[in-house]
Amino acid sequence: MTRKMPTLVRPTHNGERYEITNPTAMPKAAGFLWNQKMMIQITCRGFATAQFMQPEPAKYAYAPNIEAKTFMQPEPNYYAHHPGRFVYIKDEETGRLFSAPYEPVRAPHDRFVFSAGKTDVFWVIESMGIRVEMTMGLPTHHVAELWTIKVKNLSSRPRKLSVTPYFPIGYMSWMNQSAEWNHNLNGIVASCVTPYQKAADYFKNKYLKDKTYFLCDVPPDSWEASQQAFEGEGGLHNPSALQERNLSGSDARYETPTAAVQYKIALGTGEQQEYRFLFGPAHDEAEIGAMRSKYLSKEGFEQTAADYAAYMARGRGCLHVETPDKDLDNFINNWLPRQVYYHGDVNRLTTDPQTRNYLQDNMGMNYIKPEVSRRAFLTAIAQQEATGAMPDGILLVEGAELKYINQVPHTDHCVWLPVTLEAYLNETGDYSLLKEKVPSANGDKLTVFERFCRAMDWLLKSRDHRGLSYIAQGDWCDPMNMVGYKGKGVSGWLTLATAFSLNIWAKVCDHEGETDLAKRFREGADACNAAANEHLWDGEWFARGITDDNVVFGIKEDKEGRIWLNPQSWSILSGAASPEQIDKMLPQIDSHLNTPYGIQMFGPPYTKMREDVGRVTQKAIGSAENAAVYNHAGIFFIHSLYELGAQQDRAFTLLRQMLPGPTDTDYIQRGQLPIYIPNYYRGAWKECPRTAGRSSQLFNTGTVSWVYRCIIEGLCGLRGDGEGLLIRPQLPSSWNSMKVTREFRGATFNVDIRRGNVKEVTVRNGDKVLPAPHVKDIEPGQTYNLTVTIP
């Protein structure tokens, strides 16, 4: 009888967790946890990337060499000495060795489970008749990792084992680094001085958390604080220290520190030993002692887990669906709102989020905590420049500075004000926000409404003689940095996005009784659309832009970068594209950009530098913005299809492709668990099929707020307006029904959607048929049971 192989990827605990049962099939598959001060992403094999805020991002476990400070990178490369969390198990009688979760020994295992949960990460590894269980959790308010390690004897004989947790600390500082065992704290404490050269930086760095601690609840039998002493000549797969009777009790003196502790145990058949550890940064020993007292006990771990579960529950979202696609249900109900919550809760753990990211990430909070979205508008608009322009980044803490890409001038940030406000108003109906007076650093004190008008005026002024929007050194596409660096280049996408934004704002002006302003902004939108049609329509799609030297690009004649998705999506949203133009565009999009893994941002990819477009053309073929399945661009297209109507099959197909699975083949190709949407999957499907579909593994993306919005307002068709809730579901043709529970303005809507013999959507509230698919006069606290029949 052959043993049935476990399913590679599976949901458990009613979808609250996802498991993977093989550490080699998807080696980069990972889970992530966060609180408002830290984040950690950890792979199924045990490699980890963690950072915390003080207030700028910092590390407490480092690479083994000097590490560049940078933003989170896609497609991380893992290697033997990459930071990670491991435990070695050695049979003291036979000398055999394995490690959990899988690295660094990579020994064969009898059972492997990596379980990514919403509130913790968990492993079960069985090898050599021994079971190891590892659990990692976080506190709600502090920077620390809480680890539980259980070791059980599954064999039929007593076992003598050494259990050696190994948490490498890495190269901390070229100025000063050390580590030693601290008897008072019962753990290893590594210390460093953050490198600096300017005198002023001494005071800036004085109170940084320059210590990393690894604390044990049970005193170990021996320890190692020096990486070289632990690893020796054996290498990490068979460290020299584990070939000795005990660890040597080393320290590290301007040497690379590590944290390895060893327990010698004897386990009878079925016996188990449990250990708890605390790993994190601190400023001094007093802080470490306080963390130990608060957390490092069984009761402390249990209370922390309960508190963290309550913290995560606050991000549960406003939607629950039952559809024919159970994997999609699981993602929508459990994992999508979690990722949306992450973005709005911590703003990607940066002190200067890009303005467009900040506004779009907080757009998702409309469906979780609308007050957070409201506050974000006030924070952002207070930093408006005197010209009406928005800055490239929003500063969130005192002393923060614009860094990285925010030092490069982009021209699109004003566009996102009305675009994201529309979702806020749809969800809350809170037009009082517009009357809030907001002072700025310029000394003026204007209402939100007045500031938005200034932003729209800035967009209208920032156009050339043709009426096309200047691009400077980038628009939404950050690396399109050389189209307009001489001051003349224009963006086709931004011209259309400006029209869309102006039209949204004109509706708001109408609502506020400002009909003259509404007329002016609509005329501006019409002018942008007309300019796009005159100068950018290429017969079957809209061009991406015109360079400083007056070269139109993103057209049929281009061998690379021929057709871009964003201009087509936003021409639908802005109204620039007529029905006839849309009929021409959609087949071209299908032909040029569709892949089995979603829709490419453009195609074909660039294979060499194009100096009048910029560094986007230098990116690796099919990666990031160079013709990847860039999900943010994809969701704009999906949103435009739902707004257009009668495109639900095309929209749903693309929406579903954003999620890995459900086949093992798809999971393996993407290499990612279906617990988040990454910023991209590799594109260039025709040119580089071997790598196409590979996940970036980067969960920071503006995609997810839009995905949640598209599911709520598009697929489910439950969109708010000034009077109540509009009901216009857009089910794919393969579905005959779905059920939705939607929380909206304090009320609960239970919606049963079914196909029937009707020509238009009909809604029954209890026994009453509504005159239109529109629920008005909604009462908070009430439950509405709606039966919806669709054609």
From Swiss-Prot:
Pathway annotation from the record: Glycan metabolism; cellulose degradation
GO molecular function, one term: carbohydrate binding
Any single biological process term in GO: cellulose catabolic process
Catalysis: reaction(s): 4-O-beta-D-glucopyranosyl-D-gluconate + phosphate = D-gluconate + alpha-D-glucose 1-phosphate
EC number: 2.4.1.321
UniProt keywords, alphabetically: Carbohydrate metabolism, Cellulose degradation, Glycosyltransferase, Polysaccharide degradation, Transferase
EC category: transferase
Active site per UniProt: 478
Sequence similarity: Belongs to the glycosyl hydrolase 94 family. Cellobionic acid phosphorylase subfamily.
Quaternary structure and partners: Homodimer.
Protein name: Cellobionic acid phosphorylase
Organism name: Neurospora crassa (strain ATCC 24698 / 74-OR23-1A / CBS 708.71 / DSM 1257 / FGSC 987)
